[in-house]
Regions:
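Glycine-rich, low-complexity segments
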Residues: 1-8, 16, 22, 28-64, ...
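Extracellular ectodomain segments of secreted/surface proteins
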Residues: 62-73
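Acidic, glycine/polar-enriched metal-coordinating patches/loops
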Residues: 2-9, 71-137, 157-202
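Generic alpha-helical scaffold signal
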Residues: 21, 61-62, 84, 171
Length: 202
């Protein structure tokens, strides 16, 4: 019987009597993959041409890490994907500059989670879709016009002039965006909230 590969972490499942003289190295690699999945950390630049996290059979791979820090400045709406068959949890730090673009974390052909700039996430993949378990919403400084995602917490500085913040285009019930007058300048240089054709509750 030949070796096989596990569905999610792509571990090498060794068949009885196989791999004479090499089973130790295969076992060590499996242990390194498990270490990645339990507590591994990697940084992934989303502006690279390849935005699919890798799951190489029988080898350590960036998509097998538990913690992934996403970096880079978006020039368009982007998606980071994992293979459809993977069942796994992730801790995601979104350190990207969205530059008024969107970033989604999903399976190759399923649904996923729209990530808000500056926030951190606990996600899981059920082998079909990526689901959000929790979101840590972090305050970040803004001093220029921007279109934001639900969950944004903005320290808005209008010291250099008025600023317009445009809300998400397709809001859902319960979505929130928070603003703070960082420099106490709203009375002089206004913050304008663009509704994006939706109603606002405050």
């Amino acid at each position: 019987m030949a070796n096989s590969t596990s569905a999610s972490l792509k571990l090498t499942v060794q068949a009885t009597g196989e791999n004479s003289g090499t089973w130790g190295q295969i076992t060590n690699t499996n242990l390194l993959i498990l270490e990645q999945a339990i507590g591994g950390f990697t940084t992934f630049n989303v502006t690279n041409a390849a935005r699919s996290l890798t799951f190489t059979n029988g080898a350590v791979s960036n998509g097998k890490n538990e913690v992934i820090k996403l970096t880079g400045t978006l020039a368009s709406n982007l998606t980071v994907s994992i293979p459809n068959s993977v069942e796994k949890t992730y801790l995601i730090e979104n350190a990207c500059n969205h530059a008024n673009n969107t970033l989604t974390f999903k399976t190759a052909s399923g649904t996923g989670v729209l990530l808000c700039e500056g926030n951190n996430y606990t996600l899981y993949s059920d082998g079909t879709n990526v689901v959000k378990l929790s979101e840590q919403r972090n305050w970040r400084a803004v001093s220029a016009a921007e279109t934001v995602q639900a969950g944004a917490k903005l320290l808005v500085n209008t010291n250099g002039g008025a600023v317009t913040i445009t809300l998400p285009a397709s809001p859902a019930t319960g979505d929130e965006v928070h603003f703070v007058d960082q420099g106490y300048d709203f009375n002089t240089n206004a913050l304008t909230v663009g509704r994006n054709s939706s109603n606002i509750a405050n």
